[in-house]
Amino acid sequence: MIFVDACFKKSTPYTPVWMMRQAGRYLPEYMEVRASAGDFLSLCKDYKKASEVTLQPVDILGVDAAIIFSDILVVPLEMGMDLKFEKGEGPVFSNPIKTKEDLERLDVEKSIKNLSYVYDALALTREKLAHDKALIGFCGSPWTIATYMIEGGGSKNYAKCKKLVYQNPEFLHQILSKLTLALKHYIQEQIKAGANAVQIFDSWASALEEEMFFEFSFKYMLEIADFIKEKYPHIPVILFPKGVSGFLDNINGNFDVFGVDWSTPLELAKEKLGAKYTLQGNMEPCRLYDKKAIEVGVDKILNIMQDSAHIFNLGHGILPDIPVENAKYFIKLVQEKSKK
């Protein structure tokens, strides 16, 4: 698989390319399946439909990897939290974690069993996916998932979480440790079901100052990565901590690919991390609105990464109103222009 080879810094005939959120609302085919499922969570829980939308970008765009269709918050949901996706508001937990009793009620073992719809979707997708295409499993980072569990949803300033960082770090570490335990086994089950690589999304890494990022976020991601690499050395682990361009000097650990977001200069990431890791990213997603902007972005990134291990991706998820034609153009352009 060209994608897995690139993760391990092996030479590839061209630069493999996929997009975060590639199974998403910009695709009319996705919207059809989502409408038939009823709502977002029902789509996540229907393994046949989740598999169908996972495969759509491979068939329609020709990306080199599929990423399983799911959500990072299905883990706390199946641990016993009450999750709803409110229109215009995003995810909402009606019972956020406030006390040790709240935390004790969450059941790690039950969640691993209850998440069988994700493993079933992976198994079905791997069966249907072409042999040369990789299937990526994923989870959120413990820190990013915890922000939703503690705040009760998305947040502008993460005040409740950050209050714990400084006022009651011991309790926050207990929450993160419990989540880390669940995520290790969740990812292990994804690999058993057929995932060829795994990505850990730390979407809210940038909410923390440097010292606290390494204590409350990065440390736990590495714990998951270590667990996976020890058991499955042939499975690449991708870390994607968003907005940490100022912390790159201290990024180090047992993983294979570092995801670079669009706000981080790729030259900087290459200088600091390119020798150790394959870099993934990092085109500005809004370049996809315009074909000329796509060409300029692709040329610039391929030029920077021409002598380094690289997986092409956006620096964040594709937006819902991007024309499908432009997404196709982007994928084909990367594959053509990067031919060795």
Swiss-Prot record:
GO molecular function list: uroporphyrinogen decarboxylase activity
Keywords assigned: Cytoplasm, Decarboxylase, Lyase, Porphyrin biosynthesis
GO CC entries: cytosol
Residue positions binding substrate: R21, Q22, A23, G24, R25, D71, Y148, S203, H316
SUPFAM superfamilies: UROD/MetE-like (SSF51726)
Reactions this protein catalyses: uroporphyrinogen III + 4 H(+) = coproporphyrinogen III + 4 CO2
Site residues by UniProt (Transition state stabilizer): D71
Subcellular location: Cytoplasm
Domain of life: Bacteria
GO biological process terms, semicolon-separated: protoporphyrinogen IX biosynthetic process from glutamate
Keyword Glycoprotein: no
Pathway, per record: Porphyrin-containing compound metabolism; protoporphyrin-IX biosynthesis; coproporphyrinogen-III from 5-aminolevulinate: step 4/4
Subunit structure: Homodimer.
Purpose: Catalyzes the decarboxylation of four acetate groups of uroporphyrinogen-III to yield coproporphyrinogen-III.
Assigned protein family: Belongs to the uroporphyrinogen decarboxylase family.
Entry protein name: Uroporphyrinogen decarboxylase
Organism: Campylobacter lari (strain RM2100 / D67 / ATCC BAA-1060)
